[in-house]
């Protein structure tokens, strides 16, 4: 049973890396930290329906968030998105 658990853990880690790594490659970094406003929109892993906002590189755009997962480029309001991502 121990081998099966180990293989399951390795498989889960592999899937998480395959999902996360491309998003990190597309992100911009400032002072060694990911700039969340440069991440792509990500609706997450669930099928719920929440209207959220993300920064598309130019402006804040509405999208549907599933309720779990995703990345930091997700804001509850357009105002919150603009405040965080739009440079004055």
From Swiss-Prot:
Its main location: secreted. Expressed by the venom gland. Residues 37-85 form the BPTI/Kunitz inhibitor domain. It is found in: Secreted. GO terms for biological process: envenomation resulting in negative regulation of voltage-gated potassium channel activity in another organism. Keywords: Disulfide bond, Protease inhibitor, Secreted, Serine protease inhibitor, Signal. Residues 1-27 form the signal peptide. The record marks 47-48 as: Reactive bond for chymotrypsin. Disulfide bonds join 37-85, 60-81. The record marks 39 as: May bind Kv1. GO terms for cellular component: extracellular space. It comes from the Eukaryota. Residues 28-33 form a propeptide. InterPro entries: Kunitz_BPTI, Kunitz_BPTI_sf, TFPI/VKTCI-like. It holds the Pfam family Kunitz_BPTI. One of its GO terms (molecular function) is potassium channel regulator activity. Serine protease inhibitor that inhibits trypsin at a molar ratio of 1:1. This is Kunitz-type U15-theraphotoxin-Hs1d. It comes from Cyriopagopus schmidti.
């Amino acid at each position: 049973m121990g081998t099966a658990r180990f293989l399951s853990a390795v498989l889960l880690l592999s899937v998480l890396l395959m999902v996360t790594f491309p998003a990190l490659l597309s992100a911009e970094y400032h002072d060694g930290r990911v700039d969340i406003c440069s991440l792509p929109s990500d609706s997450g892993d669930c099928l719920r329906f929440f209207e959220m906002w993300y920064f598309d590189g130019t402006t804040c755009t509405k999208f549907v968030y599933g309720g779990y997962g995703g990345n930091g480029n997700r804001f509850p309001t357009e105002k919150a998105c603009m405040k965080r991502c739009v440079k004055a």
